[in-house]
């Protein structure tokens, strides 16, 4: 069976309902926490390390929920939402590979913010470079990622870690 290499907003919403990778497996969060509108490219090869990559996008408009509350009179997308989007995409990659379990962010190395997403922006682009996947008793994805707004890189994160768990009872 040929794997799908791009996903629409409707595909991602199906993933948030547990319909894409099957019950009990990797899911994306539902809106409003779903921070991706589409995955334009996903592959098990390529990227900075030759071990896989994802490119995804979020359309920006001034009516997005976070602009009204972060900050009043000084609207900016919270940087933590961009970081969470990168974790979301690493988890999606693990599910797309066919791995079982529910995704949980497990941390990251260095994170840098050197720009911002304002309501006047048009598009956020996420680039994820898979460094390593481990498929033992724990399924783990490790990746580096960047967030760009209208073509300008504004955040970076090293060693984003996401695990898939068949049981979260002891987590």
UniProtKB/Swiss-Prot annotation:
GO terms for molecular function: (3R)-hydroxyacyl-[acyl-carrier-protein] dehydratase activity; trans-2-decenoyl-acyl-carrier-protein isomerase activity. This is 3-hydroxydecanoyl-[acyl-carrier-protein] dehydratase. Belongs to the thioester dehydratase family. FabA subfamily. Pathway: Lipid metabolism; fatty acid biosynthesis. PANTHER family: 3-HYDROXYACYL-[ACYL-CARRIER-PROTEIN] DEHYDRATASE, 3-HYDROXYDECANOYL-[ACYL-CARRIER-PROTEIN] DEHYDRATASE. SUPFAM superfamilies: Thioesterase/thiol ester dehydrase-isomerase. It comes from Stutzerimonas stutzeri (strain A1501). The gene is fabA. Its EC number is 4.2.1.59, 5.3.3.14. One of its GO terms (biological process) is unsaturated fatty acid biosynthetic process.
């Amino acid at each position: 069976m040929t794997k799908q290499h791009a996903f629409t907003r409707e595909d991602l919403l199906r993933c948030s309902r547990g319909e894409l990778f099957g019950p009990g497996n990797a899911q994306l969060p539902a809106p409003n926490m779903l921070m991706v509108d589409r995955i334009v490219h996903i592959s098990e090869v390529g990227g900075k390390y030759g071990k896989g990559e994802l490119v995804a996008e979020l359309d920006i408009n001034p009516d997005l929920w976070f602009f009204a509350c972060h900050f009043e009179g000084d609207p900016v997308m919270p940087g933590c939402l961009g970081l969470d989007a990168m974790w979301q995409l690493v988890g999606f990659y693990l599910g797309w590979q066919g791995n079982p379990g529910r995704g949980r962010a497990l941390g990251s190395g260095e994170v840098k913010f050197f720009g911002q997403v304002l309501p006047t922006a048009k598009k956020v682009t996420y680039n994820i470079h898979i460094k390593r996947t481990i498929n033992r008793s724990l399924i783990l994805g490790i990746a580096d990622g960047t967030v760009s707004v209208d073509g300008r890189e504004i955040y970076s994160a090293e060693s984003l870690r996401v695990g898939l768990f068949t049981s979260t009872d002891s987590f």
